[in-house]
Amino acid sequence: AVAQALAQALDLPLPAASWHGEQDRMADIGAALALLTGTLGHLARDLSLMMQTEVGEVAEPAGAGKGGSSTMPHKRNPVGCATVLAAATRMPGLAATLLAALPQEHERALGGWQAQWATLREMACLAAGALDRMRDLIAGLDVDPARMRTNLDLTHGLILGEAVMLALGADLGRLQAHHVVEAASRRAVEQGRTLRDVLAEDADVVRTWGDAAKQRLDALLDPTGYLGDAAAAVDRVLAEHDRRRA
């Protein structure tokens, strides 16, 4: 009755048997915490890379005690990301401890369960701390769309060559379209020009699209219009999130 009441108070299921002889549940929850923290670490890694001076697309929330430098007052260090990454780095070793404790003799073998509880407690604290820090990061993240667009334009349209190739391939055939765009890309790099300008002068492109060539190239080489399945993927993820919370 006490166990049932505790389970209800914590909104947890009541196991059919005691944990004394079933050590897998400790490893199971530890693995879940490690996976959660590892996922947060992946996000923190990407955010920290996006904060680099050369990229500069995002920044952690500014404020007193948030990423300032003792010697360089202009800096906004990714201290939140560092905290999450530190937790994610420690988690695999802690999870390994729980896995190592699985083959215990009899019930609650000496040393095994003592290692489990200390490890599980630490993993819970690390996961909770990483989750709390990431929540603050996302809520206050400073995003620079203009810098993102600048970075997209660094290749002068080359990253969108595939879009042109696919559209041109519908008229010329894929292999010929690939040849045209590949050759135009080389000329753009050699001449220091945009892919759009080089393609607009290409004989195959002009012959295929005629007076509409420049207009079509402008549309195809606009990165905001080349999102693929991204919007649908986001909708699917949000729908799955709502379904699991229901």
Name the predicted role of every residue range.
Residues 72-246:
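Glycine-rich cofactor/substrate-binding loops
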Residues 1-104:
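Internal glycine-rich alpha/beta core junctions
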